[in-house]
């Protein structure tokens, strides 16, 4: 069996490719069923965020397993394999384990050390368990990866003041406004007319960061206006006007900055809509939705500047130098956890041999005990029988303790395989299995 991960991220694919592979929560169940339908795939889980789509799996054969996963990805995205493959990465065994732990720790994020990815890995684990697509191996890996992410954030300063996608989007707005005014600094948003489209978690984070950057009023649009009103109640110090998404165009006309973060699988704003507005002032769109909420053709409008998640790199690069130094310490913690998991996984090789040895010894114990009890005759009481049975079980457990502990103890795979072969040969475990 092999652990593999196949996917793509902000490091390997632009947003126009990533958005075609974004798997919303409502499609996860169907996608997991499709992947489990492949005979090579034993366990599987999906991580889908705005910056990555990764499929982790336990497969019988790494080559056919990876091919099956790639086939699914190509069919789901509608991108022919030849065009898709250059954007995909594949990690096997130790590299796959290391990758997931680094992802959980925020070491592979666009925004180094961001905290949201940890909750997304937790959700991946929960969805895998709810859909019964994960088993003992992936569950152990996911649990330990989440634990690793928590450990990195508690034992290093990587997460201290870490920016998120949402805060980077707000800083990008500050930077672009400053650049228009001739400054290469982040300026206050106090005088800007801000529109936020969407009322989910990302929008909540957007509003939190907008408030900290000088914004004191904004318009909040959402398809479900009650959800927008509930979100607005959490920010009593801000003047938030809530409206329905059907008022999108007229509210764009009132804005200087528009942030979008909805779950729509199709763009909600395109050039045709913008051209109807007769804009005369500069307008900035910052779209952190994946799939994108704003069509790429909007960039053709003379008064519009449109940015998506890939454009956040300009802001992120300004903050990375300090975090790169802290990341070294975090990487050493991740490596420790990787070794712990691999030692546990390698120890599973011993389980079939241990079980066979225990089964054979238990059979011998019962046979010899029965012979002894039959010689004792009817005068041997039930209580005495129980004492003798407990005695024989204790002897077997004592005999097994040292070899079982040795087989399960941390050692190289080569050493463990030598030990297993010795035990199999000494106790004729292989020959008996073949005869059976």
Swiss-Prot record:
Keyword Transmembrane helix: yes or no?
A: no
Where is the catalytic site?
50
Chain residues that bind substrate: 49-52, 109, 114-116, 120
Q: What functional role does this protein have?
A: Catalyzes the NADPH-dependent reduction of glutamyl-tRNA(Glu) to glutamate 1-semialdehyde (GSA).
Per the entry's comment, what about the domains?
Possesses an unusual extended V-shaped dimeric structure with each monomer consisting of three distinct domains arranged along a curved 'spinal' alpha-helix. The N-terminal catalytic domain specifically recognizes the glutamate moiety of the substrate. The second domain is the NADPH-binding domain, and the third C-terminal domain is responsible for dimerization.
Q: What else is known?
A: During catalysis, the active site Cys acts as a nucleophile attacking the alpha-carbonyl group of tRNA-bound glutamate with the formation of a thioester intermediate between enzyme and glutamate, and the concomitant release of tRNA(Glu). The thioester intermediate is finally reduced by direct hydride transfer from NADPH, to form the product GSA.
Q: Which PANTHER family match?
A: GLUTAMYL-TRNA REDUCTASE 1, CHLOROPLASTIC
What does the subunit section of this Swiss-Prot or TrEMBL entry state? Homodimer.
Kindly provide the name given to this protein in its UniProt entry. Answer: Glutamyl-tRNA reductase
């Amino acid at each position: 069996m092999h652990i593999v991960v196949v996917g793509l991220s902000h490091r390997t694919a632009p947003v126009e490719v990533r958005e075609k592979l974004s798997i919303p929560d409502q499609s996860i169940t169907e996608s997991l069923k499709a992947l489990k339908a492949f005979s090579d795939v034993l366990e599987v889980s999906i991580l889908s965020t705005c910056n990555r789509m990764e499929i982790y799996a336990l497969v019988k054969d790494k080559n056919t397993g990876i091919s099956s996963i790639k086939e699914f990805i190509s069919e789901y995205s509608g991108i022919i394999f030849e065009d898709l493959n250059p954007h995909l990465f594949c990690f096997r065994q130790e590299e796959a384990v290391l990758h997931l732990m680094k992802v959980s720790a925020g070491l592979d994020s666009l925004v180094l050390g961001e905290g949201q990815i940890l909750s997304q890995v937790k959700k991946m684990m929960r969805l895998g368990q709810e859909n019964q697509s994960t088993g003992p191996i992936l569950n152990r890996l996911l649990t330990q990866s989440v634990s690793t992410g928590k450990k990195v954030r508690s034992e290093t300063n990587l997460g201290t003041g870490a920016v998120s996608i949402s805060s980077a989007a707000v800083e990008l707005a500050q930077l672009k406004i400053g650049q228009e005014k001739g400054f290469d600094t982040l300026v206050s948003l106090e005088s800007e007319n801000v529109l936020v489209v969407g009322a989910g978690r990302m929008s909540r984070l957007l509003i939190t960061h907008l408030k900290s950057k000088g914004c004191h009023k904004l318009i909040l649009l959402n398809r479900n206006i009650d959800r927008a009103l509930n979100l607005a109640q959490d920010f009593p110090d801000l003047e938030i006007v809530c409206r329905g998404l059907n008022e999108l165009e007229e509210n764009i006309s009132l804005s200087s900055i528009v942030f979008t973060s909805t779950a729509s699988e199709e763009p909600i704003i395109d050039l045709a809509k913008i051209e109807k507005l007769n804009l005369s002032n500069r307008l900035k769109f910052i779209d952190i939705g994946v799939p994108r909420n704003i069509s790429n053709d909007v960039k053709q409008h003379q008064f519009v500047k449109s940015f998506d998640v890939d454009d956040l790199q300009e802001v992120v690069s300004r903050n990375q130098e300090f975090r790169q130094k802290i990341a070294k310490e975090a990487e050493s913690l991740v490596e420790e956890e990787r070794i712990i998991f691999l030692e546990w996984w390698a120890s599973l090789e011993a389980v079939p041999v241990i079980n066979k040895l225990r089964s054979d010894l238990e059979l011998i114990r019962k046979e010899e005990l029965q012979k002894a009890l039959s010689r004792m005759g009817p005068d041997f009481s039930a209580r005495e029988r129980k004492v003798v049975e407990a005695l024989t079980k204790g002897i077997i457990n004592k005999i097994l303790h040292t070899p079982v502990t040795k087989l399960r103890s941390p050692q190289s795979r080569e050493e463990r395989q030598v030990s297993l072969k010795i035990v199999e040969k000494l106790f004729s475990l292989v020959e008996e299995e073949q005869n059976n």
